[in-house]
Swiss-Prot record:
Residues 346-369 have a biased composition (Low complexity). Keywords: Glycoprotein, Ion channel, Ion transport, Membrane, Neurodegeneration, Sodium, Sodium channel, Sodium transport, Transmembrane, Transmembrane helix, Transport. It comes from Caenorhabditis elegans. Changing G710R: In deg-1(u679); prevents degeneration. Residues 104-711 are extracellular. InterPro entries: Deg-1 (IPR004726), ENaC (IPR001873), ENaC_CS (IPR020903). This is Degenerin deg-1. NCBIfam families: deg-1. Probable sodium channel subunit. Required by a subset of neurons.
Length: 778
């Protein structure tokens, strides 16, 4: 009775279907035990109860996954089929979703977080360079450099004569005259009607019987440009441009003649008075520029008073000199700039005492040109200058464009300088105290000797780096131009080489441990201005592989990296690959970049090396773009990079109230003009003391994968972590049962063989069987 009561209670606790399923399993297990007990085998028959089928049924009965149990407790085959299809469909859906999750995880996507950091901001290193790399007065003392410049000067002279022979060059003035003539033709009717109306309304016109001389004089006075005498300081070659002052000249040697613009009230350019000569030009244009001779086939009886000078540095008079009309009275009188500025009414005349150069051409209607292929721009040149191999190596053959020739001359200068030692190149460029006159940082005076370090650049010569010491780094306490670096730099334009197109300063902003690269990442500041460079700091932190490709280590140990002693930079990597490729092919390197230890740069005068270099540069292309020839070179970004964004502004400098430096023997106005033409004020400062942190992070990591994987398991199959553990236990049991059944089958076969052996041989067989059993038990 009690047994029946307990059975009823158990049935009520379980569901009906669960009870039936459990009862069937119990009866089935009992039957299997009875059948197993009836068999007479040599091994334990109780292990047969743990069959794979019973394990699966027991798992489905007790698992926390609800779907599998529904198949086994279904009342009919249709229900089992439906539940099986549903579970299988959900299993496929889960597999699809799981594959997408795995694909998303394997893509290693990343996101960039941007945040503002308020912390101490270290001031970057600033490298200052003169746009003129070497002093003209010094480089012309070195034979190899002088030869390089002579080849350039000869090429310029030759290209001008060749251009005149092939196709006469049309001047800007001739283009302007042609445009005026076209307008006259297009608007001839309107112009004629306007002139008729003007004549009718103007009854006070001057008589037309005045002399042609006075008419010519009056026309000159109304034109825009004229020659004017001024006070100048001329330094260097006599043909170089002079520095003009507003004050009267102290002596005749300080006089110069300038081209005066009436509209702008500016006198520029100015040249020493000794290079000018008086002339009577047969033709002067409406703007004031004159022609020393008439074009072929034209005649004129006019005689316009003008001042002329040679366009080149030669002492002989040019066939086409630069001429500008005079507005003074008489043949050799000229207006004085200092009198115009002081607005004096006293008429002061000065007679020029310069001796005009010997005239080699007569003023006729026909002109002759002498072909100058063998003419040199400067006398007493060495034989190597006219050597055909030298001319071929320099690459001026066939060039007529002045800009292209200047670019080529700059390259040739770098080739020549690369053959010199560092000590020799340093001596030819500006020294620290010549270049840097004044400096302050954070409102305090700098120590020019200690705070600036020399940096020799292949293109800009001597450069000087501020804040180069990592162990003693400057930090800005405030934002604004007053609390950064303010430096007065003297570039001395009077000593500029002919290859320097513009006057000013080149600066690069970079971390102290990185190479400056002023040619690529630099900024230019002109003379005569206070240039302000406001900077904002950004820190970029990139993820390494597998999320991205970046270089984690800053120190470079590769011997092929040509910028030894500096941190890794992608620009340095590209240049190193480019340079090493050229060395492999030509056995010499490009002078724009350093060479590894034991190698040399290509010679400027070696045509074979230059040809090989040009050929390889043409095949490789820009060293920033990897081609098939550089496919082995992989240049990655740094994992941590400091970026400085720069904004530029400028104002005219000096103001007139500025306390300037070395102005011995000059008035205040002369000193101001002197510095305006030769110096630049530079300000570099932080616009704000916070900085942006751009940090990469993984967009989908392992934690996200596990969470989404578990969510889909629970959604489609009703699985949890416990269910996963149950499946793992089931797999272990199934594997152990498989190997156990294989072992028992082996024992059964051995037992069967012993029964078939004759009795006289069974002892040996039994012994061997025991040995096998012992081996299995081990």
């Amino acid at each position: 009775m009690s047994n029946h009561h307990s059975k009823t209670k158990k049935t009520s606790m379980l569901g009906r279907e669960d009870y039936i399923y459990s009862h069937d399993i119990t009866n089935k297990n009992k039957k299997e035990k009875l059948n197993g007990a009836s068999k007479n085998n040599d091994y334990n028959q109780d292990d047969d109860d743990e069959t794979m089928k019973s394990k699966m049924m027991d798992f489905c009965d007790k698992t926390t996954a609800h779907g599998a149990k529904r198949v086994l407790i279904a009342r009919n085959s249709f229900s089992k089929l439906m539940w099986g299809l549903i579970i299988f469909s959900f299993l496929l859906m889960f597999a699809y979703q799981a594959s997408k999750l795995i694909f998303k995880f394997s893509a290693h996507e990343k996101i960039t977080d941007i945040s503002l950091k308020f912390d101490d901001v270290e001031f970057p290193a600033i490298t200052f360079c003169n746009l003129n790399p070497y002093k003209k007065s010094l480089v012309m003392m070195v034979p190899s450099i002088r030869d390089t410049m002579d080849v350039y000067d000869n090429a310029k002279t030759h290209s001008k004569s060749e251009g005149e022979k092939k196709k006469p060059k049309v001047s800007r003035k001739q283009h302007s005259d042609a445009s005026q003539q076209m307008v006259r033709e297009l608007f001839a009717k309107e112009i004629e009607e306007g002139m008729v109306e003007l004549k009718k309304s103007n009854k006070t016109l001057q008589s037309q019987n005045k002399s042609g001389r006075r008419r010519s004089q009056r026309s000159i006075e109304n034109r825009r440009y004229e020659a004017i005498e001024a006070h100048c300081k001329c330094v260097g070659n006599i043909g170089m441009e002079c520095i003009r002052f507003e004050s009267p000249p102290r002596d005749p040697s300080s006089k110069c003649i300038c081209t005066y613009d009436r509209d702008m009230e500016v006198a520029w350019p100015c040249f020493n008075i000794s290079v000018w000569y008086d002339h009577e030009c047969p033709l002067c244009h409406d703007d004031g520029y004159c022609e020393s001779t008439l074009p072929s086939g034209t005649t004129s009886s006019d005689k316009w008073p003008c001042m002329c000078r040679n366009r080149g540095d030669t002492s002989e008079r040019d066939d086409t000199p630069y001429c500008i009309g005079k507005a003074g009275v008489g043949k050799i009188e000229i207006r004085k700039l200092w009198l115009e500025n002081n607005m004096t009414t006293t008429s002061t005349t000065t007679t020029t005492t310069t001796t005009p150069p010997p005239t080699t051409t007569s003023t006729t209607t026909t002109t002759t040109t002498t072909p100058p292929p063998t003419t040199t721009a400067r006398p007493n040149q060495r034989a190597i200058v006219s050597n055909p191999e030298t001319i071929k190596a320099m690459g001026f053959q066939g060039m007529t464009d002045g800009v292209a020739m200047l670019t080529r001359a700059k390259e040739n200068l770098m080739f020549t300088m690369a053959a010199l030692s560092d000590k020799q190149r340093i001596a030819l460029s500006q020294s620290k105290h010549e270049f840097i006159e004044m400096c302050s940082f954070n409102g305090k005076e700098c120590d020019i000797d200690e705070d600036f370090r020399l940096h020799v650049d292949p293109e800009f010569g001597n450069c000087f780096t501020f804040n180069y010491d990592v162990n003693n780094n400057y930090t800005s306490s405030r934002a604004g131009p007053m609390y950064g670096i303010r430096v007065l730099l003297f570039v001395n334009t009077s000593d500029y080489m002919s290859t320097s197109e513009s006057s000013g300063v080149r600066l690069a902003i970079h971390p102290p441990t990185e190479y400056p690269f002023p040619d690529t990442f630099g900024y230019s500041a002109p003379v005569g201005f206070a240039s302000s460079f406001g900077i904002k700091k950004k820190v970029m932190q990139r993820l390494p592989a597998p999320y991205g490709e970046c270089v984690e280590t800053k120190k470079v140990v590769d011997r092929n990296y040509i910028y030894a002693g500096y941190d890794y930079h992608p620009e340095g990597c590209h240049r190193s690959c480019f340079q090493n490729g050229l060395i492999d092919d030509c056995s010499c390197g490009d002078p724009r970049f350093p060479v590894p230890e034991g190698y040399r740069h290509c010679s400027a005068f070696n045509a074979t090396a230059r040809t090989c270099l040009e050929k390889n540069i043409g095949s490789v292309g820009d060293f920033h773009h990897i081609t098939q020839k550089m496919d082995k070179c992989v240049c990655k970004q740094s994992c941590e990079e400091i970026i400085h964004e720069v904004t530029f502004s400028c104002s005219k400098w000096p103001s007139g109230a500025t306390d300037l430096g070395d102005c011995d023997g000059m008035t205040e106005s002369e000193c101001e003009q002197y510095y305006r033409l030769n110096a630049a004020m530079i300000e570099v400062f932080y616009e704000q003391l916070n900085y942006e942190l751009l940090q990469e992070s993984e967009a989908y990591g392992l934690v996200n994968l596990i969470a989404d994987f578990g969510g889909h398991l629970g959604l489609w199959l009703g699985f949890s972590v416990i269910t996963v553990m149950e499946v793992c236990v089931l797999l272990v049991d199934m594997i152990s049962l498989f190997f156990k059944s294989r072992h028992e089958e082996k024992l059964l076969r051995q037992s069967t063989k012993r029964k078939d052996v004759p009795e006289d041989k069974r002892q040996i067989t039994v012994g061997s069987g025991r040995k096998s059993d012992a081996f299995v038990s081990i």
